[in-house]
C-alpha cells in the first residue's frame, strides 16, 4: 500500500514499486527545482520611487507627471537612461517572478495524475474491469489533443475493448498507438488501452476514488491569475465610459425637443448644453483611464511573459530542445511576435462584455424611440452572428497555419545569418534565399486569407447597423408615421455608437484569435520538462579522493523519429460538433494512412532500443522546423508527429576520477569524449546506474563560446575584478601579446561569437575564463587542438600543470604524447571505456602501441614528456621559437579563424557597431519609398479617391435623413425613402472595396520590403556581419516585419477611415453653422501644436523601443547557444538579471508610448468637448433668435456629428501617432536595404526569383535540384571542370581604406593538381589568403589569375564556384545528412555514402535507422564537433564544378590518425584537383607538393617540404624541430613515405 495524502492507494504488484519510487523522485526533484528557481531569480533589486509614484490625483487624471519627459523627448535628445523607470509593482523582476511561481504551480497541478502511475485502477462503469495505470498524458493524433488520457495495462479489459476485433482501431494494444510508443507494459501482451481519465477510478483500500482530471496548463489563465488586479481595474472606467457615451443620445433627444419646443427658455437650453459638455468630459477622462490601464496591463503581460521565456531558456532540458518544433527560430518568434499577440488581448478584453452591453442598451433606447418597429431590426442583427462565428473559425485556422510558417521562415533566416560564412563560401545564397522566400510566399498566402476574412468581417459589421436603421425607418414609413427630428437624430447618434461597437468586433476577434494561437505555442514551450540533473553531489558520500564517480552508468540522449501519419475517422459534421459529443475511445478516432514514410517511421520507433519512460512525443506542422524536407508530400498546414527516442551514447560506465589530479580522456573522433564531460555537467540522461560529481566546475568547450562583450567581460564572466589574478590569468593563457596590439586592450570588443578572434585566441579566452573562475574541477574539451605548437606547450606548462596544479583536471584530447603527464588515463572506444588507470598501467597494455599508431602525430610539442624538457627545441630552433613568441600580433584576429578586418576600425577597441537611431521626423523619402513599394503613388491616389467617395456616401445618409425629417425639399415620402435606400445600397457595397484595396496594397508593400531586405542581406559584405549582431538583423525579420505585415496595414486603414470621417464631420458642421469656426479655428491650432509635440516625442520613444528590442534578441540567442557554459559556471542568475534589466527598458518605452498617448488624448478631447459645447450654445442662440425648422434640423445634425468628433479625433490622433511610430520599422528595414555595403552579384535577384517560381507546386527536393541546374549549368558550359591554377603577382590587401596592409606584395604560383600547404603563426596572413581567393575581401593591389584569367574578369559567384571551402568552424543545418552534405541534391545515394566513407563517417551515419536521410538537429547538436567537421569535408568533396579544395585547419578537431587517412584520401582521390590547406599540424602537409610559409603578410619561404626541412636556416625547419624529438621523427617518417595510411577507394 502507498500513502497518497490521506488516502491509501493499492499498488497493483511488486513490479510497480520502481514506478512509485520514480514518482517520489520526481516530487523531490520538483522541490529542489523550486529552490533552484529561487536562486536563479535572486533577491529583489533596490527600488527608488519614481515620478509616477509621487504624482497627485489630478496629475494622474490628466497625466501631468509625464509632461517633462514629453517635452524633452520632443526635443530629440533622449536615450534609454531618460526613460522613467517602471514602478515597483510593474518591474520585470516583480511580475516575472510572480508569473514564474504561478506557472510552475499550474504545471505541477496538471501533472497530479502522474502520482497514480503504478496504482490499480477500475473502469468506471464495469467494476470487474481492472488494471494498472502505466502512463498519463496527451495523444498527439487525436481530435482531443489536449484531453488527458490514461494508458492502462488491463488484467480484465473493459467490455467494449474485449469485443473489438484484433487489428481494428479500437483493439487493445501493447503501448503503441498510431505508431507512438506511450509506455512499456510489464507483460509482453496486447492487453493495454488508452481511456479518458474521467472514465477511471483509482482503487484504494476502502473504496474507489474518482480523481478529478486536472486542467491543462494555459499561459493566458496563468497571466490572468497573476495580473488579476490590473485586469479587474479596467472594469469601472470602461463601464463609466460606456454609460456616459450612451447618455449623449438621450441628452441629444432632449436638446432636439428643446429646439422644436415653442416656449422653451434659454436657461433650459444652456443647462442641456453644459450637461452635454460635462458628460463628454467625463466620458473622455474615463475612456482614457481605461485605455491607460488596459495598455499597461498589456505591457505587463508582454514583459512578464518574456521574463518567463528567458527563465525557461535557462532551465529547459536538453531533451526538450531536441524536439523539432522547439528550434531557435521558434523561440525567437515567440519572443518577437507571440508575446505581443498575448499582450494585445488586454487592449480589447473588456469589449467581451462592453460591446454586447452597448448593443443591448442601444437596442433598448431604440425601442424607447420607435417601439415595436425595432424588433425586425434586431432580427437583422442576430442573422449576422452565425456568419461572424464562421469567419472567426476560419481566421483562427489560418492564424495557426501562418504561425507555423512564420516559425519556418525565421528558422531559415536564423540559419542563414548564423552560417552566412559557409553559405557564401559554398555559393549557396540563392538556395537559402529561395527557401526563405518560399516560406515567405506561404506566409503571405495565409496573410491574404486573413485579410479577405477581415474584409468580410468589416462588410458584415459596417452593413449590420446600417441595415438595422434602414429597416427601422422603412417600417416607420410603412406604418404611416412621419419622421421627426427628435426621432431621427437620436437614432443617428445611436447608430454611430453601434458603429463603433461593430467596428471593434473584427479587431477584437482577430486579436483574440491571434492571442489564443500564440498562447498555445508559448504554453507548449513552458510545459517542456525542465532540466533535472541526475548527477548527485559527491559530497553526499564519503569518498575524499574522488572528484567524480560513475557506477554502471548508461548515458543517453534523445533523438526525434517521425511517426506514421494518421487521419481522423470523424466526418466534417462530427468535427463541427466535436465539443458537444461524448468523448469516446481515443483510438477509434484516427486511422493510419498509407504513406511512404509510415512503415519506415513505425519500424524505426519499434526497433529502437528504448527504456521505460524514455520516450516523449512531440508535434509540429509540416511547415515548421520538423519535416520540412517532406513538404512536397504533405499539404500545407498538415501536421507531422515525432517521438523522442532514447539513444545510448556511453554504456556501462564505471569510473572514478581522482580528485586534484590530471585525468586525460583519449579516443578516436566520435568515441564519446565530449559526452563523458557533458555527463559530468548533467547534460545527458543517466538511464541506469549512478553518477556523482563535484558541483564546482569550470568548462572549456571544444568550440569556444564567446559573448558579444569586451575581452574583460568575457574573462571575468560576471565575477568581480581581481586585478592581480586577472593579470596572472592573462599571462599564463598567453594573451599578453594579443592585448598589446588590441587598440582597446582589455576593453576591446571581440564581437559576436568572437568573430574577430582566431580559433586559437577564442580557445585561450575561453580557457582564461575558466582559470579566472577558480573552480575545483576543470573540464577541458580539447582546447589544445586550436593552438599553435609552441602556444600549446606554454598552455600545458603554465595552465594545466601550473596555475591549475592541485585542481581536478579532466582533459579530452587526441594528443597521445601528453599522456606521460597524466595522473590518470581513460581510453574510450565506441562509447565504452576500454581502459582506466595510470600511465604505467597503460604502457603495459596493448592499447599503448595501438593508440600510438592511431593517434600519433599531434601538433603539440612532446617536450612535456618525462625525458624532454619544455624548452627542448634544438639550438637551431631557438631563434625561431623566440621570434614566434614575440610576433607582432596586429593581425592576429580573423574572420572565421584568420586575420582581423577591423583591428583599428573603431576607436577604443569597439568592434560591434552601435545600432542606428534616426532623429527628428520620419523623412518624407521614407513614406515615398514605402508607398512606391505598395504599388506606387498612382495606386494610392486611387485608394484615397475610393475612401473619399465612400465617405461622401456614408455622410450623405445622415444628411438625407436630416432633410427627410424636416421635409425641406417638399418631396413625397416615397421619394425620400427610395433615395435613402439607394444611398444605403451604395454605402453597404462601397465600403468593402476600400478595405480590400488598402489590404491589397499594404500586402504588396510587405512582400516587396521583405524581398528587398532579404536580397540586401543575402549579398551584404562579410564586414557587415562581422560588425552587426545576428539578433539585431533578426529583429528586422521578426519584429519589424511583423509590424509591416499586421500593425501598419491596420494603422493606415484606420487612419484613412478616421481622417475622412473627421473631414466629413467638420465640413457638415461648418456648412450648417459657420459661426462654429470661432471655436474650430483656435482648437485646430491647439491640435496642431499638441500634435507636433506629441508626434516628436512618440517617434523618439518608439525608436528607443525598437532599438531596445535588439539587445533582448541578441542576449536570448547568446543564452541559447551558451546555455551549457553559463549553467556550468553558475551564472544563469546574472544573465537573467541582465535580461530583466533590458526588459525593463522595453517596458518603459512601451509604457511611455501609452501614457504619452493619454496625455495628448485628454487634451485634444477636451478641446473637442469645447467645440461640441459651442455648437450646442450656438443652437440655443439660434433658438432664441427664432430659427426656422429647417435650420433647427441642420443644427441638430451638426450637434449629432460633433458628438462623434471627440471619439473620431481620439482614434485619429492615436492612428497618426501609431503610423508615424511604426514607420520607424519601415525606416529600419530601408536602412538595411539601402545603406548596407553589397557584394557585386547583379544576377542574385533573378536567380532567387527563378528558383521561387520553380518552387510553385513542387517539393523542396525538386527545388534544390533546380537550383544547381539554373545556377550552374550556364557557367559550367563556359568553364568546364578542370584542375585549377592560381597565380598571385604582388597582391596587397587591406580590410578597409585607411587600415594597414594585411597582405604585403604576396607573389607565388600554384600549378594545376598541386597539393599546397600554407603554414605560419596565427596572424601571419594564412586565412586572409583563403578569403582573398574566395573574394570575401577585395585586393587593393596586384593581380590574381585563376585558370589563366584575371579574377576580376569572373563574376563573384563564378569565382566561388571554382573553390570548395572547408572552414575552420563546422556549421551544420537542420535537415537530413543528405541535405547537409549535398544541398543541391545532385549526387546519388552511392556517391553520398562513398563521400561519408572517405571522411570516416559511414559507420556513424549507418548506425542511424534512416541512414543518410536521418535527421541532423539544429546546429548539428547530435554530432560531435569533430564529426561536424568531417561532415563539412564530405560536403566539400561532393561539390561539383570546382577545381580547388581549400581547407582552413579543417582537421583540427579530429584525431591525427583519421586526419592522416583523410589527407591520404585527398592525395589520391583528388589527384586531379588543386588542394590548398592551412594547417598547424605539420604532419598534415608533410606529403604535399609545396609549402608556403607566411610571416607578417608576406611569403617568407616557399618550396617542397623536403627542400625546406633540409635547409637548417629555414623557418619551416625550425617549426619542425620545435615539435620535439618524437614529433619531428613522425614528420620525417611521413615525409619519407614510410607511414602512409592507405586511402579508401571512391566507388562508382
Curated annotation (Swiss-Prot):
Residues 231-514, 940-1221 form the ABC transmembrane type-1 domain. One of its GO terms (molecular function) is ATP hydrolysis activity. SUPFAM superfamilies: ABC transporter transmembrane region, P-loop containing nucleoside triphosphate hydrolases. Glycans are attached at residues 263, 1095, 1154. GO terms for cellular component: membrane. GO terms for biological process: response to antibiotic. It is found in: Membrane. Residues 634-855, 1286-1521 form the ABC transporter domain. Its EC number is 7.6.2.2. Belongs to the ABC transporter superfamily. ABCB family. Multidrug resistance exporter (TC 3.A.1.201) subfamily. This is Multidrug resistance protein. It comes from Leishmania tarentolae (Sauroleishmania tarentolae).
